[in-house]
């Protein structure tokens, strides 16, 4: 069926049933198999299968490996639900379960405190985007009385621009959280505490790409909100530039690749911001394979070490010990660098060309920012390869004696290497296929034939020249890289410190004050705690009142009818007063 949809361009919508009906609002659930969903399902299926085969050997000695395989399979199932759903509510179910299962995968090694903190950070930051997604769905139900894509696409041209901007803004923020764009990107780096197969799956074709997919699926709405497209364009531009600068100075291999993912997702957002949705999906399609291969190659290197360290400064000289991992990482890195002839070249460079082809001020600025980001990509890709394989060996003889490669892990890596090298040659089929179902306001065909050759070659020339400069710096003038700017980006632009000081600490203080004045204050007196204590002490109060009445009555009788009016009556009144004070100032009497 998938091949029929792919080649004959006939979408299939399968109605499975009615979920609920309230008044004139009826929400169904079903599947939509069109060109967009099929293009995403191809990398999801291939990468998931490759990761599962890879994980069989990677997790061989883990006592909880069966649980890992189950969670990984459930993750792929809900990613499929997200992709083939025919309405926003069903899509949100897949979106939400993907986030929950990613929490379980990141915290799989739950004996590590860093893994648990990272998983908590991931799910809390994604809650911000999920909240806006829910509000957007509620707005659709209130305004359109429908959430299926077909109805929304038909009604969008007749909708108020303010309402469309509001919904587009909420979808953009949801995608910003899920796809780790600047401002809500903190969870992506800490998510590297999970097993490497998790990183290969979630940061290649599944979780982080779901935000891009939702925006492309909502392209019929975004085309009527040019202001939101402009915001998306500038947000993506800053994201791809800052992530590249942070990756250049990072020493953790997996975090460099996570920042690379963040940069490439921003490239996809740049394409969407310039209304080139087909190019965004084509880059997602190609990026999934070589990024999964990069993570698998990194996992093979770490798995070969006894300590499984991720610090590239402790590697070096591995080209003779891990020749297959070197070959796969080199091919994936060259594809990421957009080397001519490889997959990344066909999907990445055309996005930068389409930015210039918009012929607007923002388009020109974003073209140069994207070119700078592509140059940084070449620099940190070559840096990873150099420090790992070409540098002077940094480990001891005992470590190198146990370095080895796994033949079981090599098979899925070989398959992804083929895709990373030759998938770009299917460019025409994929891009023209995508244009059939997506808006094509910015046509790459016009850009291809009108752009000067200099702007096509500029990213390649800058990438090669500055990469060679990086090698020179590491070989001869390494101290040049030690500066305050280096430290600034090595600390990830102090994002964690700013978040803690400006958001987390004030929120925690506000929460503590709220707890003191409500939970331990008002609710303790007027709430269930105060009422229960009052009910418990009612019998005590009744007995005290009865005792008080009896004593007053007895005193009155004795004072006026028994004791004569002498000094004894005065002495009796003094003793009686002291006795009453002692009775009514006991701790039991003071409980209310």
Swiss-Prot record:
UniProt cross-references to NCBIfam families, sorted A to Z: NDH_I_L (TIGR01974)
Example GO molecular function: NADH dehydrogenase (ubiquinone) activity
Family under the similarity heading: Belongs to the complex I subunit 5 family.
Protein keywords: Electron transport, Membrane, Mitochondrion, Mitochondrion inner membrane, NAD, Respiratory chain, Translocase, Transmembrane, Transmembrane helix, Transport, Ubiquinone
InterPro entries assigned: NADHpl_OxRdtase_5_subgr (IPR018393), ND/Mrp_TM (IPR001750), NU5C-like (IPR003945), Proton_antipo_N (IPR001516)
Known EC number: 7.1.1.2
Record flagged with keyword Electron transport: yes
Subcellular location: Mitochondrion inner membrane
Transmembrane segments: 36-56, 68-88, 89-109, 132-152, 169-189, 196-216, 229-249, 256-276, 279-299, 322-342, 364-386, 406-426, 451-471, 534-554
This protein's GO CC annotations: mitochondrial inner membrane
Recorded catalytic activity of this chain's protein: a ubiquinone + NADH + 5 H(+)(in) = a ubiquinol + NAD(+) + 4 H(+)(out)
Annotated function: Core subunit of the mitochondrial membrane respiratory chain NADH dehydrogenase (Complex I) that is believed to belong to the minimal assembly required for catalysis. Complex I functions in the transfer of electrons from NADH to the respiratory chain. The immediate electron acceptor for the enzyme is believed to be ubiquinone.
Pfam families: Proton_antipo_M, Proton_antipo_N
GO biological process, one term: electron transport coupled proton transport
Organism: Debaryomyces hansenii (strain ATCC 36239 / CBS 767 / BCRC 21394 / JCM 1990 / NBRC 0083 / IGC 2968) (Yeast)
Protein name: NADH-ubiquinone oxidoreductase chain 5
Upper classification of the organism: Eukaryota, Fungi, Dikarya, Ascomycota, Saccharomycotina
Membrane topology: Multi-pass membrane protein
Enzyme class: translocase
Name of encoding gene: ND5
